Amino acid sequence: MTGASEILDVVCILLRAQERHMTTKAAFAPEEWKVVLEAPPTAGMIVITAAHGGTFRETIAMTKAYTEARAQHGESELLDEIVAAKPKVDHTLYHSPEEFRDQGLAHLRDAVALLESKATAEERDDYRRFVLTLANEVAAAHREHGQSVSPTEAEALEEITAALGAAGS
């Protein structure tokens, strides 16, 4: 009986070690890492361009979401590296808000696909929550027509949620 107990202890230790596996920047090629880094601010910019207003407050909300990410989204080395990098997105490369939205949503899907292949399930969930929290904080940062989130921002949030594969999150 002692042998089975020892084997069970070893299995538990191995499972705990596997749970603590953390993905880092080193797991990604430079172009892949750029995609993962740029997805959160892209989500924020999708919301900003959907509303056509309040850019200053919404940008401050995006910065605040980065600052608070570590405390809100658990222990994630991957998220720590993303937050520390503070990436920027050049939305001027696009000819219209619609083009930016379409390309941005594709960018979010690409980032999630990369994380699906390289990160743990917990890290993927943390990343999705971070991106959605950021997008929601940006949407709520500027009241429009008496609403904390405008209909166009709500639509953008739904599209972001779908692109992240985070239905109901």
Where are the regions a protein language model picked out?
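Generic low-complexity, intrinsically disordered segments
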Residues: E6-L8
